[in-house]
Structure formats: C-alpha cells, structure tokens
Amino acid sequence: MKSFAALILAAVCILSLAACSAKHEKEICIWTHDLKAEDITTVSVWNMYGDKETLTVLSEEKTAELVSLLNKLTDDSFTENSECVGGTPEYGIVLEIDGEYFCINQSIAPPGALETEYGDKLWWIDNDELTSFVKSVCKVTD
C-alpha cells in the first residue's frame, strides 16, 4: 500500500512540474487563433505615399484569407514591444470587430515587419506570409 501511495505521489509531482513548465500562449496569439471572418465587420486597408492616401475595404474573400493567415500565427510570430519603439507607418490594415478597431501596420523594427496593439501591449509581428498579404492588399511597392 505504501508503494502504491508513493507511486501516486510521484505521478502527481511529475504532472505538477510538467504543468508549471508548460509554455503559455501569449494573449494575442490566442486572439488570432480564435478569430473568425464572421466576427469582423469590415477590414479597411490604407497606404500613404507622398501626399496621397488611399483607403479601401477588403472583399469577403480577402478578409477570409487574412483571417486564415492570422489563425496560423504562432507565439514565435510575436515579440512584445515593451519600450514602444517604432516609427510612423506608411501602410496598414484596420479590422473592425464589435465596434473596436485593431490595426496591423508597417513596422520599421527588426523584430517584425508589422506591428499591432492588443491587450494594452504593442507587438511586432514577424511572419512573411502575412507581411506579403498586407503589402499586396495595401498596394505597396518596395
């Protein structure tokens, strides 16, 4: 009986340690994984080069493509911009969800070509597919 109790105690300790060391997803990553196209009211894309600014609304098909790309992001795609380092973006997208607006804009920082704000934090996003998509719909030419 004592050996069975010791075995149970050992198993509980191992499981507890495993749970403590488990990597928790960043809040923003959970948000991007849970996002659905039907949650989004509109997606506006904009760019500003020189003195000309353009603003257009994405089609349902392009919105679905954007959501698919956002759903694929991983924790490694995000780096917290805790010092609020950045510049003035020249292009980006704005998602309207339940009356709130979420921007994904150009970034000039090495940790990511895009940046966003979520959960009172600024985040750099490093994902080539998403960056290419945003540049494409914003009609950015390098």
Where are these regions (language model features)?
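Sec-dependent bacterial lipoprotein signal peptides
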Residues: 1-18
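Function-determining sites in protein domains
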Residues: 20-142
